Amino acid sequence: MKREIHPEYKKAKVVCACGNSFETGSTKEELKVEICSSCHPFFTGKQKLVDSGGRVEKFKRKYGLE
C-alpha cells in the first residue's frame, strides 16, 4: 500500500433509526442507518408484513387462499 493516500480509519458511531447506537471502525465519524440488528425482523424474530395497495389480498383471491 502506498503511504499517505488512504483515508484515516477511526472509530465511528453508528446510529439507527430505532434509536440504537454502537461503535465500529470506518473512515467516517458518524454513520446513520435505517435498520440494525436490534430492529431487523431476522434478528428480533418478529415478522412484519408490508401490504402495499392490497397486493396480499389480491394474491390470495387470485390463488384461492382465503
From Swiss-Prot:
Gene Ontology terms: biological process: translation
Cofactor: Zn(2+)
Gene that encodes it: rpmE
Taxonomic source organism: Natranaerobius thermophilus (strain ATCC BAA-1301 / DSM 18059 / JW/NM-WN-LF)
Keywords on record: Metal-binding, Ribonucleoprotein, Ribosomal protein, RNA-binding, rRNA-binding, Zinc
NCBIfam families named among the record's database cross-references: L31 (TIGR00105), PRK00019.1 (NF000612), PRK00528.1 (NF001809)
Function recorded in the entry: Binds the 23S rRNA.
Assembly and binders: Part of the 50S ribosomal subunit.
Pfam families found in the cross-reference section: Ribosomal_L31
Name of this protein: Large ribosomal subunit protein bL31
Co-factor note (free text): Binds 1 zinc ion per subunit.
A GO CC term attached to the entry: ribonucleoprotein complex
